[in-house]
From Swiss-Prot:
Taxonomic source organism: Enterobacter sp. (strain 638)
InterPro entries documented for this protein: P-loop_NTPase, PRK/URK, Uridine_kinase, Uridine_kinase-like
Pathway note: Pyrimidine metabolism; CTP biosynthesis via salvage pathway; CTP from cytidine: step 1/3; Pyrimidine metabolism; UMP biosynthesis via salvage pathway; UMP from uridine: step 1/1
Official protein name in the record: Uridine kinase
Signal peptide from the UniProt entry: none
Length: 213
């Protein structure tokens, strides 16, 4: 964990898939943006850095273990974080959950005072941990995560319930136990109940607001 307040502040939010990370990140972003303006705060999802699989067939893509650190291009993410800290804009990759690969599009992101970084595997990478000013782990029971994941993936990502359940049993739960849950030890703050924990969100808002003073 670094403390370089004169640079861009990187705040990491990790936890299981469908634990409420994105809800916390979006709530913090929306409420702080209303206070300081969107030119001062932004969000980067780790999912944008899934490796490009355009060279693989769709059959091969669906076999990828997306819950293993090797599925992520953390080197590119780390490079982009360093660029932002040095005042250089980045072009954020855009990942398609339907096609299981990156699209040709990118999103231009200018350096901000605060960047909220959210994703399941952020705390498994020592380089990313070092780049963060502080980190949060969203600690939500796996059965709740599973129910949320089924609803999300079926309604928003074009998945069938059978495929979601098969992936959960084959990779999501085992990888959580092997990689994600152990990475909780590196978090500075542990938040139970995800985005429903209003007290935790208010405490985090107060902490982040200090960086704008």
């Amino acid at each position: 964990m670094t403390d370089k307040s004169h640079q861009c502040v990187i705040i990491g939010i990790a936890g299981a898939s469908a634990s409420g990370k994105s809800l916390i990140a979006s709530t913090l972003y929306r409420e702080l943006r209303d206070q300081v303006g969107d030119e001062h705060i932004g969000v980067i999802p780790e999912d944008s850095y899934y490796k490009d699989q355009s060279h693989l067939s769709m059959e091969e893509r669906v076999k990828t273990n997306y819950d293993h650190p090797n599925a992520m291009d953390h080197s590119l993410l780390f490079q982009h974080l360093q660029m932002i800290k040095n005042g250089t804009p980045i072009d954020l990759p855009v990942y398609s959950y339907v096609d299981h690969t990156r699209t040709q599009d990118t999103i231009h992101i200018e350096p901000k005072k605060v960047i909220i970084l959210e994703g399941i595997l952020l705390l498994t990478d020592a380089r990313l941990r070092e780049a963060m000013n502080f980190s949060i782990f969203v600690d939500t029971p796996l059965d709740i995560c599973l129910m949320r994941r089924i609803k999300r993936d079926v309604n928003e990502r074009g998945r069938s319930m059978d495929s979601v359940m098969a992936q959960y049993q084959k990779t999501v739960r085992p990888m959580f136990l092997q990689f994600i849950e152990p990475s909780k030890q590196y978090a500075d703050i542990i938040v139970p109940r995800g985005g429903k924990n209003r007290i935790a969100i208010d405490i985090l808002k107060a902490k982040i607001s200090q960086f704008f003073e």
